[in-house]
């Protein structure tokens, strides 16, 4: 077990270093492609312009992937700082940020009051950013999108759950949801790197909890997480 943990730590350190070191050449590619487009765009034919657009799109996607890999590495290395966390307020703030990014979408959001737990505030924010962000994204093709965040009891376990009425998923592949780079939808349908839910799982397990999911294709999804202690609901 000690050797395995040591090897895992070395692998995470390696992943962090590689991801960090990739930033410089990626910035160079982005910068030079921007110069090429702005200074020499008039000399490029339509095919060359399309190829340049694809290069810049690939650079953007690679940048997102690096950011997500660095986040995944950081949540494994960061020391836990447990303190009371108001998840209701945190969720409301995150949903307001999502609305500001996409103000035209009429998403119905229902955040249960009084959701509190003891945990690391910054890491739990990352959990909710990913879960609520996913719900927001995967309801993108629904006429009347709905998202709810609440405390619940599931199979004898006290937990929190983010529910939506979006794209859903095939339950046969639910174990893949929380594995890095495993996606149940194409990037063309719903863009993403496949690292967000793996990050959620790692944070939750560091808190002594667990993550799981239920869903049905075309009918939405429910993503659950526990924090190793009963959720505290109600009160001031």
Predicted feature descriptions by range:
Residues 208-214:
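Glycine-rich ATP-binding loops of the HATPase_c
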């Amino acid at each position: 077990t000690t050797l395995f943990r040591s090897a895992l730590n070395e692998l995470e350190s390696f992943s962090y270093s590689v991801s960090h070191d990739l930033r410089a050449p990626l910035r160079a590619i982005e910068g030079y492609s921007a110069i090429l487009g702005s200074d020499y765009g008039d000399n490029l034919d339509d095919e060359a312009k399309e190829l340049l657009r694809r290069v810049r799109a690939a650079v953007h996607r690679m940048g997102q992937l690096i950011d997500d890999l660095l986040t995944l590495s950081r949540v494994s290395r960061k020391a836990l700082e447990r303190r009371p966390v108001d998840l209701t307020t945190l969720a409301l703030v995150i949903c307001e940020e999502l609305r500001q990014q996409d103000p035209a979408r009429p998403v119905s959001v229902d955040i249960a009051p009084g959701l509190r737990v003891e945990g690391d505030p910054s890491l739990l924010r990352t959990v909710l950013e990913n879960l609520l962000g996913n719900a927001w994204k995967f309801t993108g093709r629904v006429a009347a999108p709905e998202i709810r965040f609440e405390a619940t009891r599931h199979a004898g376990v006290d937990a929190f759950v983010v529910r939506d009425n979006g794209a859903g998923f095939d339950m046969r592949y639910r174990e893949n949801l929380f594995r890095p780079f495993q996606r149940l939808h194409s990037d063309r349908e719903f863009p993403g790197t496949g690292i967000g839910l793996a990050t959620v799982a790692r944070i939750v397990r560091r808190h002594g909890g667990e993550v799981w999911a239920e869903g049905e294709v075309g009918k939405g999804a429910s993503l659950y997480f526990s924090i190793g202690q009963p959720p505290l609901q109600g009160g001031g």
